[in-house]
Amino acid sequence: PAVVCVLLKRWFSQRVLYITKRYSYMSRTMSLAAFLLPTGHHAAAWRHAGSVKDAGVNFQHHAELAQTAERGLFDAVFIADFTSSIDEEGIEGFKRMTYASSFEPLTLISALSAVTQHIGVIGTVSTTYTVPYHLARQFLSLDQINGGRSGWNLVTTANVRESVHYGVPDHIRHADRYQRAREIADLVVTFWDVWADGAFVRVVESGVFFEPSLPRGAPPDGTFFAASCQ
């Protein structure tokens, strides 16, 4: 009987483990995001008879795509960014670039937030040509407006031709771009959470709206930025 009991325990334990693993596998979910490029992902898609030729600067077109994705139960729409004017093919290649005319991502996802209810909106912003405080403020503002539906696609800008648009004659080298990206990402997250939840007291009787003595901690200075909330 003791042997039978042990065998039953082993069988039962293995069975429970199998069922648990199977249930865990079956209950996993996949997140789906719609990658919206203005005129499609094929370079010549805009030439199709049924295409929207001015899709890059046609907000109604983007709104309909986002709303369709939302009805299809997608989790998010994703907006890439291109700021270089001429690629390696020179002016002849530029003539055929459909992304030469497109919305700035943060502006676009802010507008898409207003015409959707549940779907996430993800915008691309490079850390190479921006500053952490400004970036933190932009995304937190959008996150507050749309109820936590915004996302940030962090890139470091690989195209050397983009630097001139920001008044930088020489593109920052690869290692420095990634070090800067890590520093900015850390600072942005710190800025988002730098004040305690109770810091905004809003006491009508005393007239005190904000209590600055309740910080969670000032962000540290880095290699590229001397950040301070004091």
Language-model segments: which ranges?
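Low-complexity, intrinsically disordered or signal/transmembrane-proximal segments
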Residues: Q14, Y18, Y23-Y25
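Internal, glycine-rich beta/alpha segment that forms the wall or movable "lid"
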Residues: R28, V131-Q230
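Active-site beta-loop-alpha junctions enriched in small/polar residues
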Residues: L37, F82, S126-T128, V155-T157
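Acidic-and-aromatic substrate-binding clefts and catalytic sites of carbohydrate-active enzymes
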Residues: Y99-F103, T128-Y133
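N-terminal beta1-alpha1-beta2 module of alpha/beta enzyme domains
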Residues: Y23-T116
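Short beta-strand segments at enzyme active-site cores
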Residues: F74-D81, V121-I122, W152-V155
